[in-house]
Amino acid sequence: MRLGNRPEDIRTCVHLRWHIHGLLRQENASVVISKCLRHGAWRLLLWLLLLATWDVGSGQLHYSVPEEAKHGTFVGRIAQDLGLELAELVPRLFRVVSKDRGDLLEVNLQNGILFVNSRIDREELCGQNAECSIHLEVIVDRPLQVFHVEVEVRDINDNPPIFSVAEQKILVAESRLLDSRFPLEGASDADVGENSMLTYKLSSNEFFILDIVNKRGKGKFPVLVLRKLIDREENPQLKLLLTATDGGKPEFTGSVSLLIQVLDVNDNAPVFDRSVYEVKMYENQENKTLVIWLNATDSDEGINKEVEYSFSSLASSIIRQKFLINEKTGEIKINGAIDFEESNNYEIHVDATDKGYPPMVAHCTVLVEILDENDNAPEIVLTSLSLPVKEDAPLGSVIALISVSDKDSGVNGQVTCSLTNHVPFKLVSTFKNYYSLVLDSALDRETTADYKVVVTARDGGSPSLWATASVSVEVADVNDNAPAFAHPEYTVFVKENNPPGVHIFTVLAVDADAQENALVSYSLVERRVGERLLSSYVSVHAESGKVFALQPLDHEELELLQFQVSARDAGVPALGSNVTLQVFVQDENDNPPTLLGHQSGGPAGEFSQLVSRSVGAGHVVSKVRAVDADSGYNAWLSYELHPTVGARSPFRVGLYTGEISMTRALDESDLPRQRLLVLVKDHGEPMLIATATVLVSLVENGQVPKASSQGLPNSSRREASLMDVNVYLIIAICAVSSLLVLTLLLYTALRCSAVPMQAGCGLGKPTLVCSSAVGTWSYSQQRQQRVCSGEGPPKTDLMAFSPSLTPCPVAEVGMESHSVGGDVPGKPRQPNPDWRYSASLRAGMHSSVHLEEAGILRAGPGGPDQQWPTVSSATPEPEAGEVSPPVGAGVNSNSWTFKYGPGNPKQSGPGELPDKFIIPGSPAIISIRQEPANNQIDKSDFITFGKKEETKKKKKKKKGNKTQEKKEKGNSTTDNSDQ
């Protein structure tokens, strides 16, 4: 076959034209030309050569690349085809510009090759167009040249055939004729050419075949052709599968499900289950009673299946009067009275007709047999009702009388009576068809307030008939339940200083009875609280049970108010119960710190102190003492200097001890008189502050009064007596297990030696010193115990606590003073009547024993022995071990507390009593000092217990005989142990 002017020959040579420039540069260009010559296409070849020459002159190139080519796929040597050298691509600014997407193709400037840069999707780029090309413009400068490049994108088979829906529904009537055609929706393929040429295939079946219809310009479409009639009653629907395959390599397929719905025609008549139905029924049935429910079925569907029922034309008028038929459901019901004596059988003819066209009819016969029955039920009559019934009624009490009757005769007239189960009653037969309803078990209204008693009378007929009568038995209440509280006692917390009449709690008692028996009233169980009646503190509302505080409560006066509230009902006799209320009065910080005494003669909280200029750092100058009537953290006191004192001041105050000590040695620049303001703060909210003013006068060495040296021998004896204090401490710790036996022995010895010692010991002044770091204690009852030593004067400065004893006179308490020549008067004072125990001290006091009775101090030849750990009082700072938080601040007040402090500069010498000891169960440190009664300088670091203590009177100086007595006794004045 020769190559001529046919369209396919022209397409072949046009394709050669696109690549003519590449072919001329390759070795097989001559082969192509010779091929064209052999086929005699001289004119076409000449035209192609001219066209190629024109393309080279105009700078247009043609390439082709398949779609979906990978990145880097070779397209053509564009630089070589344009006649450009590789070395001049960069200098001449070689660049490629695309009118379409510019990132699909790219040129490597190193080798001048055009390659695929990103994925090319022909369907996305050109859609269903037969030709798809990418147009590029190649621009170079020096001189400026523009080349046009056309890259054809060849289609590949990368898209399967797709149907628009997953399932196609086709409606086919079962009466359709053979060869009926049903067009289907074809598939589409996004590819072009052979890749989009589709062929269809239908799944095998006996009813349909597939035919392909060629529509001009629209492709091929599948059509279903009916080859066999379909019976809807056998095959209501068919499911087929239509598959489309494209012509690409490899080929792709797509499928769609065909759902064929077969439409019904009226070709079936209704059918009854049976042609004759037999029914038996009793007489006297209620109107509209169902006789029979007929059912006729039709194999068709839709309106052809709907059936209507009716009496046949053969039915008599009596049948139409006595019975009704529902034309939709086929129910035959009674329309009047059916009496066995009137007729014992009926014959009913019924038709069933469908709604199809033409309508079809079915027939049946219903034979109804009437049976005689027991058609009279028993009758019940209730008389002589005795209601309501008290819940304490005795067993056997008659509640009601019952009579029964039945109009029937024989076995149908024999009646028996019964009650419902689980009721506390029973029936007692008194005569034929007469019964009594009596109480069978005890009643409890709180469990069940009323009973519904159902009396059932049943005859002996078959079937048996019965009648029922209800009796509502109400149980009358008896006051047999006392009011009950949910809990036996309640705990209430009330802050002190509450407003009068404030509601603090509500009690609630519930009475299980009813009406007035359940009406509860509340009242206080009166008693005395101290010197006052309980009703002066609280009251309770009689109806609501609300408890009110009638006056402001004071924690310092009353920490716990325990009382009972009584609840009584209004029954006869009245019943009641009590509940206990424990009202804890919570402390508030309503008491500021109170400074203890002053000795300077100035206003309260102000005193003077003489200090030698030669004292060094750490020397204790004085001590500020204060108490707080509150408890817990509200009574935990701390001391600090007022900021106005200045950083240059040589003084400082212990944070928790109140000791004023030197921070450095004094120099000439220090003023001779300095005024120190000490702030005493508690830890409450809000914080309350007291201010103490200390007037310090700096004097020379000779002007400071010095203690007499006569006390040195006595001091040596004390040092010798207590040389082994640490040994005693270790022994005391190790011998805890034998402490009880030792206590009993010491107690007996002390009691036996108490009487002789009274004659040989002078009356001294007891001084109990507290160096507590945590605030104050409340006042506790105390008694004076005197312990005598065989070597020295009687020691009367030991004191034991005993809550069971009456309070003894307490020595005056004041601020420390270093004035010379002052004697403390021996006149005792009665304690402040406001003093009382605090919660923290009571916890400690109950866990302590009297020092004498518990054997804590033991008198011996060398003086009393110490049986507890000791701490020196000379340590000026809190870190020396004196700081102890208050009870309630995280410290167990019922445990022994051993306190040690680093760097204690003062140690007890032999024969001395330790400066301080710790009472078990107490957070404070007790100091015991052995001093003569005529000591010139009062060192009474006395702990006061109480709400507020008046500032003590100034101590008067004593002269004359007392001074002479001091010399005779050989007692010397000692320095203040706090300094």
Swiss-Prot record:
The chain crosses the membrane at residues 727-747. InterPro entries: Cadherin-like_dom (IPR002126), Cadherin-like_sf (IPR015919), Cadherin_CBD (IPR031904), Cadherin_CS (IPR020894), Cadherin_N (IPR013164), Protocadherin/Cadherin-CA (IPR050174). The keyword Cell membrane applies. It is a single-pass type I membrane protein. Residues 1-59 form the signal peptide. It is found in: Cell membrane. GO terms for cellular component: cell-cell contact zone; membrane; plasma membrane. One of its GO terms (biological process) is heart valve development. The keyword Transmembrane applies. Residues 60-726 are extracellular. Residues 64-163, 164-272, 273-380, 381-485, 486-595, 611-707 form the Cadherin domain. Residues 859-979 are annotated as: Disordered. Residues 938-952 have a biased composition (Basic and acidic residues). CDD domains: Cadherin_repeat. Keywords: Calcium, Cell adhesion, Cell membrane, Glycoprotein, Membrane, Repeat, Signal, Transmembrane, Transmembrane helix. Residues 763-923 are annotated as: 5 X 4 AA repeats of P-X-X-P. GO terms for molecular function: calcium ion binding. PXXP repeats lie at residues 763-766, 828-831, 861-864, 902-905, 920-923. Residues 748-979 are cytoplasmic. Glycans are attached at N287, N295, N578. It comes from the Eukaryota. Potential calcium-dependent cell-adhesion protein. May be involved in the establishment and maintenance of specific neuronal connections in the brain. The protocadherins alpha are expressed from a single gene cluster similarly to immunoglobulin and T-cell receptors. The N-terminal region containing the 6 extracellular cadherin domains, unique to each protocadherin alpha, is encoded by one of the large exons found in tandem array within the gene cluster. The C-terminal region, identical to all protocadherins alpha, is encoded by 3 shared exons. This is Protocadherin alpha-9. It comes from Mus musculus. The gene is Pcdha9.
